[in-house]
Amino acid sequence: MRHKRSTRRKRASATQLYQTCKATGTCPPDVIPKVEGSTIADQILKYGSLGVFFGGLGIGTGSGSGGRTGYVPIGTDPPTAAIPLQPIRPPVTVDTVGPLDSSIVSLIEETSFIEAGAPAPSIPTPSGFDVTTSADTTPAIINVSSVGESSIQTISTHLNPTFTEPSVLHPPAPAEASGHFIFSSPTVSTQSYENIPMDTFVVSTDSSNVTSSTPIPGSRPVARLGLYSRNTQQVKVVDPAFLTSPHKLITYDNPAFESFDPEDTLQFQHSDISPAPDPDFLDIIALHRPAITSRRHTVRFSRVGQKATLKTRSGKQIGARIHYYQDLSPIVPLDHTVPNEQYELQPLHDTSTSSYSINDGLYDVYADDVDNVHTPMQHSYSTFATTRTSNVSIPLNTGFDTPVMSGPDIPSPLFPTSSPFVPISPFFPFDTIVVDGADFVLHPSYFILRRRRKRFPYFFTDVRVAA
């Protein structure tokens, strides 16, 4: 039989033990100092507080919350909320009511009548007019001041040649002052101006090697784009849509939204469902403005893209920096070009056997009128005689009747033939040409097919067994 384990009883607290053992003197040594507050820590606080005051800090054996107001920095006061003061109003007079006064307020005494409508007009009484006449015999005297000598006012104009070009100076317009016109001199003298020589600034370039009229740039360094750094991946784009509409390579075009501007930086937001049309532009969230540069004698169209491969919990996106480029056209340096390149022309006929002459003098050639009636011509043939091939007749006419145009008479050269000419019509090739071939030779061992063993499925243990 299994014995039941006795449960552990909880010990009485120090306060409960102190109430029972104090009178009998059987208290443990740690009960009386803890209840009476005579422990070592209490004695340190008791005697140490005589020399140091920590009352404002709230240090004690309590919960450590800093007291009622909490912990505050030394030398500062806790924030207090200002209580708004209400404006003082005059007291309200309360009418006293006696015990014998009536509590019913009479409405007839306090009722006032309001007159509606406009007031009645007052009718004036008929009366005459009072006319008063008076006559004054004193003559009118006008005070006229004597006219003295007229004063002449002068206006002077000063021209500063430092701020005005002398070649465009014009005499000022006449000014009017007090009825007198004052004219300036009609001409401008050039002797009063100073001729300042122009200085040439120091230019850090060789004027003999200048090939264009492009202004000389300053000494300000050109900012590097950083397209070919180690941290930038290089991707070549072949699709021509990269030049005009690069957004079609990243996301699908939606005509319901506003179109993208290819000259600005493009921002994209991808979803996890639809991939990019071009796999090279996968996870691209930003495609910066285009830049046209020259790289190894080519005009290169470049754009820098930013990928968002990873995304942290805080929302920060991490991805690679890719340089997309497409070469437009090559640039040939000046050293590789030939300014006056001449080509040697080979004669079409042998000039040693031909004997003809052309008049070295000047002759006039008059064009005849175009004949409306075209004379049909027979097909002309040219013969080429060689030792390796047979004579072949090739028609040179296009099939249409060509009008005969008159001109200077130039005899055609005559060529001797090594073999008699036999015209053949129609023309067919004499030899049979068979075009057949392959780029590999199959080994003879592959022509023999191997015999395969037949397999019969016996489903004893769900495994096929070879017979």
UniProtKB/Swiss-Prot annotation:
Superkingdom in the source lineage: Viruses
Compartments, as annotated in UniProt: Virion; Host nucleus; Host early endosome; Host Golgi apparatus
Coiled-coil intervals: none
Pfam families in the record: Late_protein_L2 (PF00513)
One Gene Ontology molecular-function label: structural molecule activity
Keyword annotations of the record: Capsid protein, Cytoplasmic inwards viral transport, Disulfide bond, DNA-binding, Host endosome, Host Golgi apparatus, Host nucleus, Host-virus interaction, Late protein, Microtubular inwards viral transport, Phosphoprotein, Viral penetration into host nucleus, Virion, Virus entry into host cell
Disulfide bonds: C21-C27
GO BP, sorted A to Z: microtubule-dependent intracellular transport of viral material towards nucleus; symbiont entry into host cell; viral penetration into host nucleus
Residue numbers covered by motif Nuclear localization signal: 1-12, 448-456
GO CC, any one term: host cell endosome
Record PTM text: Highly phosphorylated.
Major localisation: virion
HAMAP family, alphabetized: PPV_L2
Its job: Minor protein of the capsid that localizes along the inner surface of the virion, within the central cavities beneath the L1 pentamers. Plays a role in capsid stabilization through interaction with the major capsid protein L1. Once the virion enters the host cell, L2 escorts the genomic DNA into the nucleus by promoting escape from the endosomal compartments and traffic through the host Golgi network.
Homology family: Belongs to the papillomaviridae L2 protein family.
Subunit structure: Interacts with major capsid protein L1. Interacts with E2; this interaction inhibits E2 transcriptional activity but not the DNA replication function E2. Interacts with host GADD45GIP1. Interacts with host HSPA8; this interaction is required for L2 nuclear translocation. Interacts with host importins KPNB2 and KPNB3. Forms a complex with importin alpha2-beta1 heterodimers via interaction with the importin alpha2 adapter. Interacts with host DYNLT1; this interaction is essential for virus intracellular transport during entry.
Name under which the protein is recorded: Minor capsid protein L2
The gene coding this protein: L2
